[in-house]
Amino acid sequence: MMTVDNDTNLVALTFAQEKEGVEYFDEAKMKQTLADVRAEKLTAWVDNTKDEPLIAQLPKPGKIKKETKNDVLGYTELQLSNGATVILKKTDFKDDEVRLNGFAKGGKALYGQADYSNMKVFDFAANACGLGNFTNNELEKALAGKQANVSLSLGMNWNTVNGSSTPKDLETMMQLLYLHFTALKKDEKAYNTLVNMLETTLKNRDLQPEAQFSDSIYAGLYAHNPRFTPLVAKDLKNISLDRIMQIAHERFAAANNFTFTIIGNFDEQTIRPLVCQYIASLPGKEKAVASPEARTYFTGKASIDFKRKMETPKPYIAKFLGGDIDYTLKNDIMASYAGEVLSQILLKAVREDAGATYSIGAYCGLQPRQEGKARLQVQIQSPISKPELVDTALQITNKCIKDAAEKVDPEMVAKVKANFLKDADVNAKKNNHWENIIFEYKTRGIDTYTEYKKIVEAVTPADISAFIKNEILAKGNDLNIIMRPE
């Protein structure tokens, strides 16, 4: 075995982008790094894979109390003895896929400002934990050769658990689900590794103009609400593994308020005993908790226009429009139409005709809120080709939206409609698409599948113009964010 025990014929190199504020490796640091490596005491690798089952003692199985079928959406709903609901939808879309999704009311909105930083890293930290008798690293080794995973997540108003497996490893996925609810294990080593990785990633973030532009978008869009700010380096000083573990236990202590969907290629009969063994056996005495509406949005007309030093001068613009609207399938479809049509209009006018941008697109969609409402949000974002074309690009964008509120090209609408119908047929054969369909149906009572194509077919160019005029422009909310080079 060859080792380098002196500096003869040794060259150490470091490559880094030259930028103000960036910390570089100097000669002293490089020498110290080499010395640290040589001083390490290395031991031979030992395979310490644990030769034991994931669950040392299986829980007493629960029971299925009731079964009902939904013939419209093609699933079977099971009511379990612990109060949990399980929805089974067998498909043949992918031979090697079974998907798990669980959801219950709760989420980040239940926690105040003292936990904002913890909320930003919750998903990372919770999934760096161990399970049962296994550390995170030991768990990875124990699962080698298996295709099964489960993870926890907190949305703004929902506690969620997601997983996937092959049919062969379905029971392993169910065991992982059980352990996430009952035996989440604090793993300081894995947590510290995560924090170190985040520190490295975020260290030079603020030096990037794109990050500063993103921060301005968050601040403007969410009305400077500190809950809605991106993860930055200083957040890492305010996070606590103990607190994150406590929150995880609070949100995932019991399963009685959860609905679990299992979709994919599984055996209809053998899955029921697994449901009883690993889901019906979970604790089930938690009171339902509905979280408050936490999202705040800008209102009225506003502009954030600032300059930043850039090595390569490249301005950015972002425009936001919209307001509150009823959360319905028709409005969701109309929003999608508006976004696609505006994208095509802007691409031609701002990029192709004016040459003012490298690329431009419009996203228009509904962000669900409480009590059957949603926030209709139009987002137009673009890097501008030349600093002197910023105002021109905005003027053209504003004119295009105003003109679209009066009339849109029927041929353009026909192309969008054809794409929507084609995508609907493709998506109908995807397990993750059915997860979304069932989630919307169970949480908001909206069937986004049965009437979808019928509504898409019926939309006319006049409908789209009326939607842009009445539901976008008439709201009177218009936010422009502009970042120019110094």
Outline where the language-model segments fall.
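Conserved alpha/beta enzyme-core scaffolds, especially Rossmann-like or related mixed alpha/beta domains
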Residues: 251-253
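M16 family metallopeptidases and their MPP-like homologs
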Residues: 1-2, 9-17, 87, 94-127, ...
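Proteolytic maturation boundary segments
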Residues: 1-113, 256-261, 266-309, 322, ...
